[in-house]
């Protein structure tokens, strides 16, 4: 298990990818201790001076004008957690919950939330012990923060709710005991600090980012396999073409295709003197389309890297000046728009792949047997697999509709504009699964097409991708039950083998 020393505000996308994909041991850098304590001292000074400060000694939302008596402050913090834990739906899996918790720890430890080190360390202890609170998938509109899901996370600290440990749901007290913890009593401001923030929205979008990166890598590899299977030209990837346009993503995508295809292969040599002038767009324009997708992925990654290190609590404690300021950092609009950008990229990655699959079905376009099978008529080959890819592609078109343009008033119109960032991020998972299956079909089709080229080899970099599939799925000499092969190929893609074939530093978190 990897140990990560958390320096608040300095987590990288590579760190976050690892935290999402693997259990980790977190330690908090000691440089965080002083700012954390100073923010707590500031809250205590406000209480001692009997100043009124939102979230410290007032109600919440539309009830912000209600002053809370000092003797009720602890009960106020407990009440907000209990009342706000109103999420519904299936539970988030351990990987997402772990990522949510670490993002919350990172934000709180910046020292602008007025929450004690003891509470932050309790969250760290839970992560390190592999005790993951029950957090339902649904219930947040992404402003004022992700209140309901973060309340479910916080229930466990109070000894309420339940948590999963080694795959088993346990009552809160039992789960806390597994981590060596006792229930906490929250002090002034701490309940609100735990609940307010964009960490669930960010975690949902980060998962979408990581999956988009993995699928970008796979689509680049399989797109090159299809170029060779369809006897496509390498000239559209010439660096000069892309340099004169100047789009950074396109330039890098074209460089990736040159890297994968190599200067020559047995297949490219077999048709270098053919009379074909231009390839269809789905082969020829891959750098332009995939480069645009790469640009969207990178832009989203930049936003999510910032948000993952942000303080998105409200109010914020500025201890140096002794101020507590109310603002709107909990509004997850940047996350929602980043997720919408990722949705566009995923939809286009899948759409372009489906076009290449369709090309290979057509003997006039691919110069391969119809539907990639010999003895057509008796055999239908890839006919309906292509239809499945088409269905998934069209499904993603609907899912790609921007979530950030939606809003609905909440909290008696006090919170009258919301981001819908959780929905924006969560639908990326469904889109990614669709794209993974589309790419699985292309991988199967491209390798079938290559095998139909009399065993000619593709480039040295691409051959391992071809051989990996053939270790698990054999050549189609006749029709057979197709769905299991799609599932096998999809699972291999999910194992991220294609990332290893990508040039270094192409994708933000890799």
UniProtKB/Swiss-Prot annotation:
InterPro entries linked to this entry: Aromatic_Lyase (IPR001106), Fumarase/histidase_N (IPR024083), HutH (IPR005921), L-Aspartase-like (IPR008948), Phe/His_NH3-lyase_AS (IPR022313)
Enzyme Commission numbers on file: 4.3.1.3
GO CC term, one of those recorded: cytoplasm
Modified residues (2,3-didehydroalanine (Ser)): 144
Keywords: Cytoplasm, Histidine metabolism, Lyase
Record PTM: Contains an active site 4-methylidene-imidazol-5-one (MIO), which is formed autocatalytically by cyclization and dehydration of residues Ala-Ser-Gly.
Family matches, as PROSITE patterns: PAL_HISTIDASE
Gene3D superfamilies, sorted: Fumarase/aspartase (Central domain), Fumarase/aspartase (N-terminal domain)
Keyword Phosphoprotein: no
Crosslink site: 5-imidazolinone (Ala-Gly): 143-145
Pathway of action: Amino-acid degradation; L-histidine degradation into L-glutamate; N-formimidoyl-L-glutamate from L-histidine: step 1/3
Location of this chain's protein in the cell: Cytoplasm
Reaction(s) this enzyme catalyzes, per UniProt: L-histidine = trans-urocanate + NH4(+)
GO MF, any single term: histidine ammonia-lyase activity
Enzyme class: lyase
GO biological process entries: L-histidine catabolic process to glutamate and formamide; L-histidine catabolic process to glutamate and formate
Family note: Belongs to the PAL/histidase family.
NCBIfam families: hutH, PRK09367.1
Name this protein carries in UniProt: Histidine ammonia-lyase
Gene: hutH
